Amino acid sequence: MDESAALLYNSNSIIEDKLDDFEFIKHSAKLKSVIDATRRLNLHKSKHNTIIFVYSAPKVGSTSIVSSLRIFCSNTCDIIHIHDEETLKVLANITDVTVNEIILYNKHLGKNVFVIDVFRSPIERKISIFFEKIGPYHFNNIDSKVNKYDIIPVIHRFNNVFPYIGNDDHFIDKFAIPIPAEFNFKTKYVLVENNGIKYIKLRLMDSKQWHQILTKLLGTPIVIVKDYESLNKPIKDLYINFKKTYKIPINLLETTMQCKHLNYYYSDDERNTYYTTWILKKTDPIITYNADEYKFYQQLCMENSHIDYIQLDHYRDEGCCCKACSIKRNIVATRLLNGLSFDTKICHIEAKTELLVTRAIQVNKINSSISQSVLPRRKQFATEMGKIVAWGK
């Protein structure tokens, strides 16, 4: 029996004992697809009973959470970072399975499953999303050259696409779970348990409390590390200039304040503060792209784009669980728990090289110690006999 067949057999065995199990599990074709997706994500090899899906929209602060969880939980949990089905397609060539099905399947296998999502204030997120692909997508150029562009056409382009980017929220729109009547503004998070899966919703504005929240909910000490900020990228000068220069058209601000996600995750006072902050940066209303114009814009950008843009190296911890990475991860975790910082990444090549260098240094120290040891002096026969003869005289 091959590995896939064994997984299928085990799943079918479970179905017999769970009459109320997830519907898609009972369809063999779909089940095989989900099992294959699990294999492609390497979850079939895991010996951990807990899996954490950081399943969020892009540019909300999720990368920081992923790296933090990898540093502190990799020895007990699997951590999976997914934005959407497109992520599954690009990274693992998974095309016929949804993220929710993968999540449900892991619960079906008896795993302890957490799903974490984050909300970020809408205007800031739109800016971040726009700059994420400003070179290869919006201006069909490399970031280092776009970094030197005049700010006026950049602002004009951003305003035109403003209504169409950064509008999704996975917790409300994609998880298909009951949503509490209001966000818990006291605890700074929402926890919903559905089908035995724990869904956690955080807010980026509360990131300074994330370590306390996640330590409590996950039952292990966690320190949050900063990760992948636009100020560290090739377009940082343009990004800084944009944030300093940008004034929001009043009609875009008014539309933003009507956002259902903003009105759910922010209290009345928080929304008033947010509005007050941006009303000081308002400007005259504009006419943006309409839906058809934006669709044409998307098509044109895709056709013109010739620069591949897939981010694979933007984590402080890339998640490798080899011995070298685990050793470095333990060192980093200890530093963070002691209030110290770290300025390196945990990636396999660097960790392996560092371990080899460390071992070489240790071997050299041992060899040096051995060579410097004072060995017992061999007896000199002639000298000793001379002493004996002298004593006998």
What is each model feature region?
Residues 1-50, 296-393:
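Juxtamembrane luminal stem/stalk of type II transmembrane Golgi/ER carbohydrate-processing enzymes
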Residues 2-269, 274-283, 297, 372-373, ...:
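PAPS-dependent sulfotransferase catalytic domain
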Residues 3, 16-18, 152, 233, ...:
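Generic detection of intrinsically disordered/low-complexity segments and helix-coil linkers/edges
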Residues 83-87, 133-142, 289-292, 298-302, ...:
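A short, terminal or domain-edge coil/loop segment
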